[in-house]
Structures are given as structure tokens and as C-alpha cells.
């Protein structure tokens, strides 16, 4: 679940202070652009939230790419869609799961896919 939707407590709010934390769905200005749920890559699943520190341009939580290089997302307006990732290679968004691999902190190089996630997680305050 997108950590900027709902009230995750003080721990997660502090990592992206320049972005709006949507406590109520009535406050989401562009609900068709903001995702609520997305498929997370199995190597970075560690809790119930999907969270990255936007200013670092590093994946802490990586999106899944099961669906031919895409993941499924549900949005705040109720629609669902898939998004195809573009970055492959060593630092790519598209990567196979590695059994036993846990944790992230993968540089987002180039930042194309990372920026897409930022742009669809919230908006600047």
C-alpha cells in the first residue's frame, strides 16, 4: 500500500516531508493519478507499505514486474491498470526475483521508472 495514503504513523511520514500525506480520500486532488496499491517485487517485501525516499533516487521498495515487465496498480478513484517499466539491467526496475534476497537500496539509474512512481504516489505540498 502506498505509504502516502492513509495514516501510517510518524515513522513513514517523515521520509517524504515535501509531499502530501492523504489522510482522507476526499483530500486527494487527482485520484485518477494517485495509486493506492501496487504489486511489490518479492525481494523487497518487508512490511505492508510501499515506501521510497523520493529525494534519494534509490529503490528501497521495488515494484514488481511479473506481467511482462509491468505491475498492476489500483488508483484512488477506483480504477486499476498496469504500468510497464522501462529500465532494465543491473539497476533496472525489471528484474527476476532471487530466492532469499531481502532488502532494497538499489540505485535508480536512470531515474525514469523511479520518477514515475514518485509522480503517482502523491503531490508536492
Regions found by a protein language model. Name each.
Residues 1-125:
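Short, well-structured segments within or immediately adjacent to enzyme catalytic domains
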Amino acid at each position: 500500500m502506498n505509504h502516502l495514503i492513509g495514516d501510517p504513523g510518524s515513522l513513514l511520514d517523515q521520509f517524504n516531508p515535501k509531499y502530501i500525506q492523504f489522510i482522507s480520500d476526499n483530500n486527494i486532488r487527482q485520484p485518477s493519478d494517485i495509486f493506492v496499491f501496487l504489486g511489490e517485487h518479492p525481494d523487497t517485501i518487508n512490511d505492508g507499505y510501499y515506501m521510497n525516499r523520493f529525494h534519494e533516487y534509490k529503490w528501497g521498495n521495488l515494484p514488481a514486474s511479473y506481467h511482462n515487465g509491468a505491475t498492476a496498480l489500483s488508483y484512488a478513484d477506483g480504477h486499476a491498470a498496469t504500468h510497464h517499466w522501462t529500465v532494465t539491467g543491473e539497476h533496472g526496475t525489471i528484474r527476476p526475483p532471487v530466492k532469499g534476497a531481502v532488502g532494497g537500496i538499489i540505485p535508480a539509474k536512470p531515474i525514469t521508472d523511479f520518477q514515475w512512481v514518485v509522480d503517482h504516489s502523491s503531490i508536492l505540498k
